[in-house]
Amino acid sequence: MSSSDSPQLHNIFVYGSFQEPDIIHVMLNRIPEIVSATLPGFKRFRLKGRLYPCIIPSENGEVHGKVLMGLTNDELENVDWVEGNEYERVFVEVVRKDNSEKMRVETYPWINKNDPDIGGEWDFEEWKRLHMKTFIEAFTEIMERKRNPQGKGRDDFSNVLKEEDPANAPSS
């Protein structure tokens, strides 16, 4: 097979829940090589009422995250499906933390930079402690239904991953 016949592979910078290998395994059915990296020129934010963050351009910002190395076109299609239409896949340059090399990768910034739901900083460790279990359970169910389309879809996944507003929670 010549190099022109080989499948195109993608390197994807992730900065939220997809930094967690267990979630990547659910989405891709494998854990690819993962390297730590920093994305300059962006800032990561919480999204009001949601269990996942967004990034938007910010001149002096930087986002710490991971690069998923060598994703196939089919795997990239899964990531696109999960990210939905509120994110846009774009090429960016990140700096690897292990060797300071720059890499051209793809990532998913939030499309609506003026979204009123954009809030304060999003913290990965806090998310793992408070929301990871719920996220993995919902994500596993949605990915299983995507592979065997007999029911819920991506919108159901988004609804499950919205945080409960304590003011609207039923009293016990």
Swiss-Prot record:
Segments carrying the region annotation (Disordered) are 146-172
Could you tell me where the Basic and acidic residues compositional bias lies?
A: 146-165
Enzymatic class: transferase
Keyword check for Ion transport, yes or no.
no
GO CC terms of this entry: cytosol; plasma membrane; plastid
In terms of superkingdom, the source organism counts as: Eukaryota
One Pfam family matching this protein: GGACT
Name the protein family. Belongs to the gamma-glutamylcyclotransferase family.
Protein's UniProt name? AIG2-like protein B
Please report the organism this UniProt entry assigns to the protein.
Arabidopsis thaliana
Gene name linked to the record: AIG2LB
